[in-house]
């Protein structure tokens, strides 16, 4: 049985490991003795049905204070990773597909007809190739028709942008997408209700606004705290990434947190600022295998997460993380003066 001292030590260790863990996480509130907050997290859908050897030492306490209401069909694996690929890039079929099949990994491919999709088949997939990805068991997600950023000015066009991709999927025998990725990782509060009405269960954003967009850094998805239509990316791969950057993103998985990873082309000639070298991508996937990660598509989160249980304030966890990270950065700057 963990003492309070042991509980505090293990919780701090978990925060140090991931580097960006939220102070408002269910585990932290349990450690602080804030049982009311723990119950709120559980009601929102936090999965505490974790293996009994959970290193945070908080599982028993969570269950004691209302965790007997299981919110998902299956226990969450210790290292749960979601792979996502944006923009219908040709290399998704020619390079990514065989690598994922070799490792037997799941993944979501978010398709759009934006950019030069209709005329440039050197850099973008055909719908026949997208259909083949579906036939292989991968998820086809919605990334809007024109890769339209979701802003105040474009909200009115969002239903048709999403419905167009849904119709195209239907025409090629692909199920209507239930997962969505925000083009350009641009989010807007009023999009949540709209996405729900369009049948979207899970929506992935980037690592911003917690982190700047430029370096692709992000945070893990915390079910019950993060809204299922505002799922953050733990990492958004960039051409200057190293294996260490990828490992840092993956290491955030655990203790009830999920590492959702964002890729574009492998390679990506039309968007070189989000390009991933194939050789490095191969190393990334090997690392996931060596770490014995459970690697799934975004839709398959429904096996572990109840998408109908929502936090009271969708953006509260985002603001909390921003405040914590800002404080940490200020402390670092003060120590270097």
Where is each model-derived feature located?
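C-terminal domain-boundary segment and adjacent tail
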Residues: 67-70, 117, 170-172, 202-214, ...
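Bacterial N-terminal signal peptides
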Residues: 9-18
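Ankyrin repeat structural motif
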Residues: 34-43
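Metal-dependent polysaccharide deacetylase catalytic core of the NodB/CE4 family, i.e.
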Residues: 80-81, 101-201, 207-232, 256-268, ...
């Amino acid at each position: 049985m963990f003492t309070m001292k042991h509980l505090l030590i293990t919780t701090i260790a978990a925060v140090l490991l991931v580097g960006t863990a939220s102070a408002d996480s269910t585990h932290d509130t349990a450690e602080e003795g804030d049982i009311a907050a723990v119950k709120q997290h559980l009601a929102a859908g936090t999965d505490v049905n974790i293996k009994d050897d959970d290193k945070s030492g908080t599982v028993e306490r969570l269950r004691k204070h209302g965790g007997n209401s299981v919110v998902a069909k299956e226990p969450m694996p210790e290292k749960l990773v979601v792979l996502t690929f944006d923009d219908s890039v040709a290399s998704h079929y020619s390079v990514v597909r065989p690598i994922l099949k070799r490792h037997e990994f799941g993944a979501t491919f978010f398709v759009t007809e934006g950019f030069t999709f209709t005329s440039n088949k050197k850099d973008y997939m055909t719908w026949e190739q997208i259909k083949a990805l579906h036939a292989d068991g991968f998820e086809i997600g919605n990334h809007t028709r024109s890769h339209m950023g979701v802003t105040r000015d474009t909200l009115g066009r969002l239903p048709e942008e999403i419905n167009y991709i849904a119709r195209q999927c239907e025409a090629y025998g692909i199920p209507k997408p239930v997962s969505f990725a925000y083009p350009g990782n641009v989010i807007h509060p009023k999009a949540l209700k709209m996405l729900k009405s369009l049948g979207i269960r899970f929506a992935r954003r980037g690592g911003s606004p917690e982190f700047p967009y430029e370096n692709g850094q992000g945070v893990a998805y915390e079910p019950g705290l993060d809204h299922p239509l505002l799922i953050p990316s733990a990492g958004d791969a960039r051409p200057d990434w190293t294996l260490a950057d990828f490992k840092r993103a993956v290491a955030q998985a655990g203790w009830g947190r999920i590492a959702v990873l964002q890729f574009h082309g492998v390679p990506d000639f039309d968007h070189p600022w989000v390009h991933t070298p194939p050789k490095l991508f191969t190393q990334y996937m090997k690392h996931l295998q060596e770490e014995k990660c459970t690697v799934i598509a975004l839709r398959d989160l429904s096996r572990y997460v109840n998408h109908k249980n929502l936090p009271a304030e969708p953006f509260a966890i985002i603001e909390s993380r921003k405040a914590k990270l800002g404080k940490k950065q200020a402390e670092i700057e003060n120590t270097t003066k």
